[in-house]
Structure formats: C-alpha cells, structure tokens
Amino acid sequence: MLQNPIHLRLERLESWQHVTFMACLCERMYPNYAMFCKQTEFGDGQIYRRILDLIWETLTVKDAKVNFDSQLEKFEEAIPAADDYDLYGVYPAIDACVALSELMHSRLSGETLEHAIEVSKTSITTVAMLEMTQAGREMTDEELKTNPAVEQEWDIQWEIFRLLADCEERDIELIKGLRTDLREAGEGNIGINFQQ
C-alpha cells in the first residue's frame, strides 16, 4: 500500500530505536483495541496494555527479562476474528494486534528493522482504511498521500523517528518521555480517545 521514505531511513537506527519506534506506534493503536473490547465485551482489553508495558520495561529497566514466547501465546487468544463481528471497529483492533505481535516477534528473533517497517505500514493502513471506509470508496495511493489523516499519521511517525534518530545512545529519559506523552494523550492513530 503506502510506501514512505521513513521505511528506508529506519535502516539507520539501532535495534533499541526500532523497538521504541514500534512501542510508540503500538501505544497509538492501543485505544483502537481497548475501545473494541469495551464495546463488544470481547476478552480482556488489559492484556494488550500489560504486554506493551512489559515491552516498555525492557527498554527502560536494565536486565529486565520477559518471556515473549509465553506472552505471545497468551496474546494470540486475545485477537478478535473479523468474521465474528459486524462492526468496523474489529479491523483497527486486529491491526493493533498485528502491530503488537510484530513487536513481540522482533523481541524473539532479534530482527527489528523488518518488524519496525511492518508496524509502520500497519498503522498507516489502519488510517487509510478508515478514510476509504468513511468515503465509501477505494482511493489511489496519490489520493491517500494527500489525505489529511494519512499525512498526520506520517508526520507523527516522522516526529518519533527524528527524536530517536537524534540519540547517540539509548536515552532512557527520552523513552520514558515518549511513553508518558503518548499515554497521556490517550488518542489513537484514528482519533479514538481512550484514557486508561
């Protein structure tokens, strides 16, 4: 779908920067999952929050150990099936789950670049699909590139990227600041507000 130069630039970042980038985007997708769980009483919306908190912990606490195999297993049961719901909200919720799964797989494999690119694409796809659904039609990549909501999502991804790219080494305060800012904003990538 939508390509962006950010996907090439991510190659310049180190593993911890990729993981932080992915965690930031998952933080912005969390409200989509939490709201879906609340509306449908599906599963435990807090499992996403708990796993994401563990990922932040691995970024900020020296020698933090997490069994991501076990977390991934638990999480797979918390992913809704699109066919079970006649509700648009299931799609952004699934996208949020795909992104968090990518992030966990990156922690298991140690391969962070390709997963960071996938999380970026997943987040932008969530935004683009909502825009097309609201418009009631498919849009070309050219139309989507100039769509204000899509532009805003790219701008936020670039802003996170720049903050991370400016770091010479792992900056715990920056990581904590990003987490706090995104959590306090409480707004998802498609405008859902969900304060925890």
Label every PLM stretch briefly.
Residues 2, 12-153:
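Structured binding/interaction patches within domain cores
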Residues 124-196:
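C-terminal auxiliary extensions adjacent to catalytic cores
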